[in-house]
């Protein structure tokens, strides 16, 4: 509902099946509200942000559905301290193809084992994306992470 989107302060691009290219309406929403509202992307929503920022989303060699992995904050982040390591819940078969270069999107977190990007930020436009699921019981301090994301 367009009226609800216009009235909200935050837009969450949610997890789901498939690939970002399967959801052209989500791309339109992202492009319309980027820089005007806080946008948070989780899993498919994270991939949707990258897809719209000229990232290539590809099939992973290994599928992670219901896996817990350690992630490391690798760059300065508005949300997390650099070098912090914690466990997160993963449910995905797609990933960002690298190398990826962007003037406005910064990779802030990576899988500690595989080095796959796990979080992005665009502080200038108030955009945050997470390949992992902060709402999952597999994510350490998930409720705290969600509160931090929403209050940033």
Which residues does each predicted region cover?
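Cysteine-nucleophile active-site neighborhood
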Residues: 8-79, 87
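Conserved hydrophobic/aromatic beta-strand scaffold that supports enzyme active sites
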Residues: 68-70, 117-119, 129
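Acyltransferase
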Residues: 137-152
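Phosphate-binding/catalytic loops
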Residues: 85, 130-140
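Glycine-rich nucleotide phosphate-binding loop and flanking beta-alpha elements
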Residues: 18-19, 97, 138
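Short amphipathic alpha-helix with an adjacent loop that forms part of the alpha/beta core around
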Residues: 1-8, 100-101
């Amino acid at each position: 509902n367009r009226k609800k989107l216009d009235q909200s302060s935050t837009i969450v691009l949610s997890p789901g099946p498939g690939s970002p290219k399967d959801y052209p309406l989500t791309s339109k929403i992202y492009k319309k509200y980027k820089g005007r509202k806080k946008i948070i992307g989780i899993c498919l929503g994270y991939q949707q942000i990258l897809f719209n920022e000229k990232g290539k989303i590809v099939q992973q060699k290994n599928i992670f559905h219901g896996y817990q992995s350690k992630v490391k904050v690798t760059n300065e982040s508005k949300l997390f301290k650099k070098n912090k390591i914690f466990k997160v819940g993963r449910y995905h078969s797609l990933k960002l193809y690298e190398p990826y270069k962007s003037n406005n999107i910064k990779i802030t977190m990576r899988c500690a084992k595989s080095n796959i990007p796990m979080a992005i930020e665009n502080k200038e436009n108030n955009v945050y994306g997470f390949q992992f699921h902060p709402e999952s019981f597999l994510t350490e301090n998930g409720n705290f992470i969600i509160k931090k994301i929403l209050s940033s």
